[in-house]
């Protein structure tokens, strides 16, 4: 089973991916964690590393390569904004692909709480990060991250609590597996 889950920062992808991973006994691989680890290794913050990645496409290519390689082994929940795109570009079809969305201010509040930052700081960082990623994805892969047509399921994660979002996805996986 290969499950991809994507969404902009603050939509709950990591929380949901962990729940899916635990329930179905799948490996959980998060592109964002790989990106953060690379930033830390280079002694940079996330914003600074995002700008660095704009000038150094090898960063994104390495993350993508790792994701595709791991997905080919199966039994995985692959979390990342480009996870579904990268698999499909490499002729690997996910069992199910999910995109989580939520209004900007809801996402900002979640990020602010998670990062222990004030709302304005979190909003500024969120906007800068999203703009940087959108630009990189377009330039590197000609991917419009706003095109959600490749996903099986799109869920507004602000409309339900975590248990509700997970329940919807769990039922979809169970029905897809039959």
From Swiss-Prot:
The keyword Glycosyltransferase does not apply. It catalyses: CMP + ATP = CDP + ADP; dCMP + ATP = dCDP + ADP. It is found in: Cytoplasm. ATP binds at residues 7-15. It holds the Pfam family Cytidylate_kin2. InterPro entries: Cyt_kin_arch, Cytidylate_kinase_dom, P-loop_NTPase. Its EC number is 2.7.4.25. It is an enzyme of class 2 (transferase). This is Cytidylate kinase. The lineage of its organism: Archaea, Methanobacteriati, Methanobacteriota, Methanomada group, Methanococci.
